[in-house]
Amino acid sequence: MLNPSIDSLLTKIDSKYTLVTVAAKRAREMQLANNCVVEKPVSHKCVGKALEEIDMEALSYVPSEDKVTE
């Protein structure tokens, strides 16, 4: 089972696609710098640690104002 749950994560970030993008970018940062904000993470992988940071609200994002025009 995924910990933290997808339902819990989607209360923090509005879209599952945005959630994946934010978590992936943070995981790449952690791979390079190894600077996890969570003191005792449950996961040992960077993506899991990034999701834990999002769930703890230690990580946030600012939505872009750009709109796609056709």
Swiss-Prot record:
EC id: 2.7.7.6
Originating organism: Bacillus anthracis
GO biological process: one example: DNA-templated transcription
Assigned protein family: Belongs to the RNA polymerase subunit omega family.
Catalytic activity: RNA(n) + a ribonucleoside 5'-triphosphate = RNA(n+1) + diphosphate
SUPFAM superfamilies: RPB6/omega subunit-like
Claim: Cell membrane is one of the keywords in the record: no
Name of the gene: rpoZ
Protein name in the entry: DNA-directed RNA polymerase subunit omega
A GO cellular component annotation in the UniProt record: DNA-directed RNA polymerase complex
Enzyme kind, highest EC tier: transferase
Domain of life: Bacteria
Function: Promotes RNA polymerase assembly. Latches the N- and C-terminal regions of the beta' subunit thereby facilitating its interaction with the beta and alpha subunits.
